[in-house]
């Protein structure tokens, strides 16, 4: 394959910027603020193919610690699967998914993804099976209280959220 495989672009400014541009172009997904605010950690691992300094395809690994029936588990969520329009039809996503599955099959308890309708026939080629999703909703009446909406642009508010998160995990 004439393209370069890179298994993390967080520390590479040129490839990180190109990854973000492809995500915006493909999904209108803006990673810039998420990255600048410190939420992009070593647990989010883009596997990219680069043509020079340009990211042309990506499959991301998101390492997630879960508690399932009282047991600690490490799951891998695959996401941000994308290929630049000019490079589609060359098997780049297939190569990246196979690489991710090879790298992680013995290092986690399960691998999963969420697929939109346009790619439901693509993922079974890699052993993924369709699962029924459930969504529950209910109405809530407003409750009086001294609640404060957090502003994620405010450093103190972000730190408060992280402190609460760490207390529960």
State where each predicted segment sits.
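A conserved beta-strand-loop-helix scaffold within acyl/acetyltransferase catalytic domains
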Residues: 3-81, 169
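Conserved acetyl-CoA-binding loop-helix of GNAT-fold acetyltransferases
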Residues: 83, 89-102
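Conserved GNAT acetyl-CoA-binding A-motif
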Residues: 102-116
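An acidic- and aromatic-residue-enriched active-site/binding cleft used to recognize and process polar
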Residues: 64, 116-119
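Conserved active-site tyrosine of GNAT-family acetyltransferases
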Residues: 123-124, 128
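Short alpha-helical
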Residues: 14, 118-121
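Amide-forming acyltransferase catalytic core, primarily the GNAT-like/NAT-type
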Residues: 129-169
């Amino acid at each position: 394959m004439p393209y370069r495989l890179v298994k993390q672009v967080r520390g590479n400014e040129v490839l990180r910027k190109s990854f973000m541009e492809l995500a915006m172009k493909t999904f209108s997904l803006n990673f810039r603020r998420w990255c600048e605010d410190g939420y992009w950690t070593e647990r989010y691992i883009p596997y990219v193919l680069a043509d020079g300094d340009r990211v042309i395809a990506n499959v991301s690994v998101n390492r997630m610690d879960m508690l399932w029936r009282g047991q600690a588990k490490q799951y891998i969520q695959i996401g941000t699967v994308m290929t630049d329009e000019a490079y589609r039809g060359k098997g780049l996503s297939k190569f990246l998914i196979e690489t991710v599955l090879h790298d992680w099959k013995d290092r986690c308890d399960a691998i999963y993804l969420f697929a939109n309708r346009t790619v439901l026939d693509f993922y079974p080629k890699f052993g993924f099976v369709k699962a029924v999703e459930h969504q529950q909703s209910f109405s809530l009446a407003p409750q009086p209280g001294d609640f404060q909406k957090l502003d994620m642009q405010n450093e103190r508010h972000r730190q408060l959220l992280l402190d609460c998160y760490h207390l529960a995990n």
